[in-house]
Amino acid sequence: MSDVLKNARRIVVKVGSSLVTNEGRGLDAEAINAWCVQLAALVRQGREVVMVSSGAIAEGMKRLGWSTRPKELHELQAAAAVGQMGLAQVYETSLREQGLGSAQVLLTHADLADRERYLNARSTLLTLLGLGVVPVINENDTVVTDEIKVGDNDTLGALVANLVDADALVILTDQRGLYSADPRKDPNAQFIHEAEAGTPELEQMAGGAGSSIGKGGMITKILAAKRAAGSGASTVIAWGREKDALLRLVDGEAIGTLLIASTPKVAARKQWMADHLQLKGSVRVDDGALLKLRDEGKSLLPIGVVEVQGDFVRGDVIAVRSQKGIEIARGLANYAANEARLIARKPSSQIEGLLGYANEAELIHRDNLVLV
């Protein structure tokens, strides 16, 4: 394994439910304490560490006497609310024993989608890291209304890595790493020691494994690595049961699969746009506009738009799609959806005549547009 982890100064560590719970029946305090011992060792090396930890729902289920994961949203939220108390307590106790302060940070997609809240969250986390505190992060499951998670904690880990400009994301799981096929089904499956994050071949290889307690599978980890690569963070997917896995990784030992961020780092504002999971709408563009955006780095003009979908307002992040529906970019809309429909396929010189005013000549300016 390369020196990516050895040289990393700021690391986001994500641990899955199976590594911090007793097979889904409440938290495994001994396991969490072992992780905290390793986190403390990393801090003593001069590194900054953020922990993204699952386990709240499993702990809540135990405290409520539930043996199976509920399906109703309000029951999942109730379990999360109960379990967050225990999760925070265990981490606080274990980190305090190592001489470290801890902070619980609960995030939602809305916190990351709103630019001002995003910047506030970033400022808070960077301040905590500067104080030598270990933030322990989870989705604020109790107040999420559309679904119980951002998607999963793998995705949350990648979003946090981008939020704090981490050098590396470590995803610790109950699997050794990434294989060319599902090793449980294919005896010829080859272990992948190192690859480039974001390559289509990786997504094709990934299976859909997942347990009854957690929600993640290998595909979510592949996509998380792709997302983290946007801000320059490489990702390691490793088996969390390896003894001293974190310490061995930062020593350069070849544990797990390393997915290297090889693409140019995206500017912070554009990374924020790329990280949006829920978009208010989209526009389809003709082939000429597609070439201008993709190959020449131009702005999106109304004349290149052939269809407007959704209900968005000025300043919302929207997707830009090819005529085949493939997302090629996203950016901040200069006009609301109803306005965009009126000016679509029209030259910019006609905007004022059609709307009675003209905010901008572009539907999306190139400074507010990122290719995906």
From Swiss-Prot:
ATP binds at residues 14, 173-174. Its EC number is 2.7.2.11. Substrate binds at residues 54, 141, 153. GO terms for molecular function: ATP binding; glutamate 5-kinase activity; RNA binding. Residues 280-358 form the PUA domain. The keyword Kinase applies. The keyword Cytoplasm applies. It catalyses: L-glutamate + ATP = L-glutamyl 5-phosphate + ADP. It holds the Pfam family AA_kinase. SUPFAM superfamilies: Carbamate kinase-like, PUA domain-like. It is found in: Cytoplasm. It comes from the Bacteria. Pathway: Amino-acid biosynthesis; L-proline biosynthesis; L-glutamate 5-semialdehyde from L-glutamate: step 1/2. PANTHER family: GLUTAMATE 5-KINASE, ISOPENTENYL PHOSPHATE KINASE. Belongs to the glutamate 5-kinase family. Catalyzes the transfer of a phosphate group to glutamate to form L-glutamate 5-phosphate. This is Glutamate 5-kinase.
